[in-house]
């Protein structure tokens, strides 16, 4: 009996890659306007390893109707492809699933399937394996694939040219009943062809069950459940198995272009995962800390093949782990690990990022702040920064809490004293015009700016003076930061504001979440809920983009970002729980 797989979650492959938990494979629509992509627009089978243009393994075409546009519809378990750009099964359909983390399966009726390689190294090749299977070695991607037809006929056009096969084209033709079925498996050195696969529907049903189990652990509240389902799909599908420098099961930033883990993105994802799956959330934190160096520094980002160590990211980790502690996500072993790593991370900033020796650490570059091109960094760094001081104060507070819970009472006292002393030093040292602001390390010249970054000091809540809080809140509401969609990263009145300027204006998930938390901590509950609700509305309208036009709400850059999905889920949960 044929099983029917029904999903309540559906999405557009034009916006979201089709993948599954654990897999390094995905199917994505690559747009002609996509930055840094140098391949023709179309639908591609990809690896999400760090391979640049070589991520694209095969372009997918359905040659029926003269090879016109493909229409794609997807759920977490199955993607349906229709030739001719219209949903009409009489013209043929190809169903796709990802039955294991290392394979993709295509089943078709009434159409052909064409897979075409992207021009690359002359050493890439295709050779017959026997039993109808072919082995494809893609040098640029660093992958070997086996194509095994389960039903129908595989036609191969891959002429040998001295040391390889370029170009390579594979076509699946239906059998006499008008159907075909083929599985593509990735492997390293050895794999035996297997023609005995479970029925397609059984494999799709198992995928759907895996997603539903994940979704059940990360349930949404309130009226946001439909979009929350997509958010949970993004998190589930962005998980990869450990490989290379990625040492644990980890949620990538996206399975679109930026397929790595950055050393502050991961905190927001961990917070979203924490209530439903503390172990996965902790892996999300530790994937970065596994690469903490001998000085205590964290890398900028981690990919499967490389660790980016020439930049870093801000110490938001104490703030994030402090929230995880309040959620009850960490067992004693996790707390021990957190304490040791956070202590070294904190010491790094005071020991190695304070070149003028004044006790106030600095950023060497905008990338180190996470806000790469924010307006304070238009002038030459190093810059001493209010957000950096704030994060270090909060990190020492979290270290004190951890020390208490680990029965390290003397260390807890020491961390609280250090936090209090640094708060006093930072506020006296950085305060200009009634608030902490950016200054040049060494000269302490003020850096005039209209960035949202200085407002993150509101995370200190009532530890700031009342006059400082009042001044910050007044300018936040009156000076062009708050729009109908949320909170801009640069005042919309600023001469540096740019609608698609990355950190020079667009709305981002992490800045929104940090500001919502800051406003709650400052007692501005109504404003916090209003900004959080506007962000939820923004995502409902424009999807899970990397960032958004602060004026129009239009989605910008990547379209399936995990920290946008994470922030959506956290805010939906937190705002609905607030009176």
Give, region by region, the residue ranges found by the protein language model:
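Extended, well-ordered alpha-helical scaffold segments
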Residues: 196-199, 203-206, 210, 223-230, ...
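Specific register positions within alpha-helical solenoid repeats of the TPR/Sel1-like families, i.e.
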Residues: 271-275, 319-326, 397, 404, ...
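The feature captures the catalytic groove of carbohydrate-active enzymes
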Residues: 171-196, 295, 300-316, 323, ...
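Alpha-helical support elements that line or immediately flank enzyme active sites
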Residues: 260-291, 453-465, 512-525, 532
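Extended glycan-interaction surfaces of carbohydrate-active proteins
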Residues: 218-259, 284-307, 354-384, 421-507, ...
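Aromatic- and histidine-enriched alpha-helix N-cap/loop-to-helix transition segments
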Residues: 257-268, 276, 308-319, 337-341, ...
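Short, ordered beta-strand-loop transition motifs
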Residues: 1, 96-102, 164, 174, ...
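Terminal accessory carbohydrate-recognition/targeting modules of carbohydrate-active enzymes
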Residues: 1-223, 256, 521, 562, ...
């Amino acid at each position: 009996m044929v099983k029917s797989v029904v999903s309540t979650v559906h999405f557009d492959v034009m916006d979201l890659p089709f993948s599954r938990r654990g897999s390094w494979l995905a199917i994505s629509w690559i747009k002609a306007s996509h930055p840094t992509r140098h391949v023709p627009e179309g639908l591609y089978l990809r690896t999400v390893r760090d391979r640049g243009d070589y991520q694209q393994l095969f372009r997918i075409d359905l040659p029926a109707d003269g090879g016109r546009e493909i229409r794609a519809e997807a759920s977490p378990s199955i993607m349906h492809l229709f030739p001719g750009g219209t949903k009409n099964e009489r013209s043929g359909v190809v169903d796709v699933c990802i039955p294991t983390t290392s394979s993709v399966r295509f089943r078709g009726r009434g159409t052909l399937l064409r897979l075409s390689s992207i021009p690359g190294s002359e050493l890439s090749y295709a050779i017959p394996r026997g039993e109808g299977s072919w082995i494809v070695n893609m040098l640029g991607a660093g992958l070997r694939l086996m194509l095994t037809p389960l039903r129908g006929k595989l036609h191969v056009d891959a002429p040998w040219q001295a040391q390889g096969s370029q170009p390579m084209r594979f076509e699946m033709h239906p059998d006499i009943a008008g159907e075909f079925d083929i599985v593509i498996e990735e492997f390293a050195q050895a794999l035996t062809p297997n023609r005995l696969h479970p029925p397609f529907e059984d494999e799709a049903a198992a995928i759907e069950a895996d997603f539903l189990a994940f979704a059940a652990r990360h349930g949404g509240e309130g009226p946001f459940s439909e979009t929350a389902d997509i958010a949970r799909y993004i998190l589930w599908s962005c998980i990869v198995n450990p490989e290379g420098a990625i040492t644990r099961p980890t949620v990538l930033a996206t399975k679109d272009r930026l397929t790595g883990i950055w050393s502050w993105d991961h905190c927001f994802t961990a917070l979203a995962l924490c209530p439903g799956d503390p172990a996965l959330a902790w892996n999300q934190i530790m994937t970065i800390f596994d690469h903490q160096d001998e000085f205590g520094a964290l890398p900028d980002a981690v990919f499967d093949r490389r660790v980016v160590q020439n930049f870093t990211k801000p110490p938001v980790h104490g703030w994030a782990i402090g929230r995880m502690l309040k959620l009850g996500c960490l067992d004693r072993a996790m707390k021990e690990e957190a304490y040791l790593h956070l202590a070294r991370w904190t010491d790094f900033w005071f020991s190695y990022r304070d070149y003028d020796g004044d006790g106030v650490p600095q950023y060497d570059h905008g990338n180190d702040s996470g806000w790469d091109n924010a307006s304070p960094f238009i002038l030459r760094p190093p810059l001493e920064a209010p957000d950096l001081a704030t994060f270090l104060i909060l990190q020492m507070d979290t270290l004190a809490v951890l020390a208490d819970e680990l029965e390290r009472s003397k260390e807890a006292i020491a961390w609280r004293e250090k936090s209090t002393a640094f708060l006093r030093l930072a506020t006296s040292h950085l305060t200009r015009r009634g608030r902490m602001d950016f200054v040049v390390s060494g000269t302490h010249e003020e850096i005039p700016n209209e960035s949202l970054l200085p407002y993150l000091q509101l995370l200190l809540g009532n530890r700031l003076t009342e006059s400082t809080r009042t001044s910050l809140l007044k300018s936040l509401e009156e000076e062009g930061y708050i729009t109908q969609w949320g909170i801009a990263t640069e005042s919309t009145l600023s001469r540096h504001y740019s609608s698609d300027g990355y950190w020079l204006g667009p709305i981002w998930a992490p800045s929104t979440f940090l500001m919502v938390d800051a406003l709650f901590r400052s007692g501005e509950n109504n404003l916090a809920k209003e900004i959080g609700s506007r962000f939820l509305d923004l995502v409902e309208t424009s999807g899970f983009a990397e960032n958004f036009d602060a004026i129009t709400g239009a989605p910008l850059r990547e379209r399936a970002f995990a920290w946008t999905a994470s922030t959506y889920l956290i805010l939906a949960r937190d705002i609905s729980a607030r009176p």
